[in-house]
């Protein structure tokens, strides 16, 4: 039976359970449950601390898991990213006191507080910068004011928390992270894991795209197909009205309204948008 690690708490937990449910897997209904056996799909799910998942997978105790890219890299575990899941996005950045200008080179000889010491140490080493990395498990942004560190490296979303702590971001992003599926490096992927990856990829794609249907005069079909090329090509069907055809194509969800406007402007009518709940491409 395939053994999969799932985050048991934090920002990744609910979204991980949601995508697994959409992919057809049973999930726990009680947050106190540590294990769920999905006999129908021949999978056991283990609910673990997100930071520990890469360790379990890398050691071979579990075949795969869902965790953050930042947590995988920080762990130095022998695990490999298989699939990005399009949620749990964050950026990992340096930040220093707002009362001076900072460059990454200024970190040399300084103290850097972070909850991701492995990731930060590896990044500084790649830049040939020598600095003391101070590990903290939380409230990293308070470390400068309390005199524990000179700068910090932390996950940033809006930056509001940093500004409230008197800090500002500097330098390029250290890492862009999101939720990912991982497996042990060099591990021969079993059939059950291939199915899970294929299902999750289908959900990710379904969330990313919508299905667009519209009618268009034949004379404008070429222009319309350039606007909605689809993944392979659009489906074109004849209509009872001889000078018109029906077109169906997948369109990126984020582009939906712009595409509808462009189609309307070239004479398309009956433009309909349908959500995609699952797919295999």
Where are the model-predicted features located?
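Small-molecule-sensing regulatory modules
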Residues: 1-43, 47, 67-80, 85-91, ...
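Short, structured active-site "lid" loops
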Residues: 42-61
């Amino acid at each position: 039976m395939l053994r999969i690690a799932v985050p048991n708490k934090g920002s990744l937990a609910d979204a991980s359970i949601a995508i697994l449910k959409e992919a057809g897997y049973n999930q726990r209904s009680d947050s106190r449950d540590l294990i769920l056996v999905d006999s129908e799909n021949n999978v056991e799910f283990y609910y673990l601390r997100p930071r520990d998942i890469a360790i379990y997978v890398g050691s071979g105790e579990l075949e795969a898991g869902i965790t953050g890219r930042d947590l995988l890299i920080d762990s130095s575990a022998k695990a490999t990213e298989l699939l990005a899941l399009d949620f749990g996005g964050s950026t990992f950045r340096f930040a220093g006191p707002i009362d001076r200008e900072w460059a990454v080179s200024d970190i040399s000889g300084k103290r850097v507080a972070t909850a991701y010491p492995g990731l930060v140490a590896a990044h500084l080493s790649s830049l040939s910068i020598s600095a003391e990395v101070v590990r903290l498990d939380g409230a990293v942004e308070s470390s400068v004011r309390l005199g524990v560190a000179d700068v910090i490296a932390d996950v940033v979303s809006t930056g509001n928390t940093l500004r409230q702590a008197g800090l500002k971001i500097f330098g390029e992003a250290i890492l862009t992270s999101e939720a990912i599926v991982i497996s042990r490096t060099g591990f021969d992927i079993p059939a059950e894991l291939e199915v899970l990856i294929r299902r999750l990829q289908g959900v990710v794609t379904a969330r990313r795209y919508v299905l667009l249907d519209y009618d268009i005069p034949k004379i404008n079909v070429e222009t319309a197909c350039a606007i909605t090329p689809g993944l392979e090509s659009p489906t074109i069907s004849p209509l009872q009205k001889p000078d018109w055809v029906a077109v169906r194509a997948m369109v990126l969800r984020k582009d939906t309204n712009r595409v509808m406007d462009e189609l309307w402007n070239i004479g398309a009518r009956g433009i309909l948008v349908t959500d995609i709940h699952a797919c295999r491409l």
